[in-house]
Amino acid sequence: MASDMLCCQGGTFRHDGCHDKGRTGPGPGVAAPADMLGWVRSSAVSSRSAP
């Protein structure tokens, strides 16, 4: 479980790690929400940093 989360939160590397484990089923499903959360967090940080 922990390894799966790290794999999906690894940004670009998450695809290589998740797919390397053969988790083609849950991989994409878990990666989609992770990408959205990451994008939202990045946007929030950028908005705060913006003058």
UniProtKB/Swiss-Prot annotation:
Phylogenetic classification of the source organism: Bacteria, Bacillati, Actinomycetota, Actinomycetes, Mycobacteriales
Organism: Mycobacterium tuberculosis (strain ATCC 25618 / H37Rv)
Identification of the protein by name: Probable antitoxin PhoAT
Family: Belongs to the PhoAT antitoxin family.
Induction description: Part of the phoAT-phoH2 operon.
UniProt KW keywords: Toxin-antitoxin system
Functional summary from the UniProt entry: Antitoxin component of a type II toxin-antitoxin (TA) system. The cognate antitoxin is PhoAT; the toxin gene cannot be expressed in the absence of the antitoxin gene in M.smegmatis (strain mc(2)4517), and abrogates the toxic effects of PhoH2 in M.smegmatis strain mc(2)155.
Assembly mode: Interacts with toxin PhoH2.
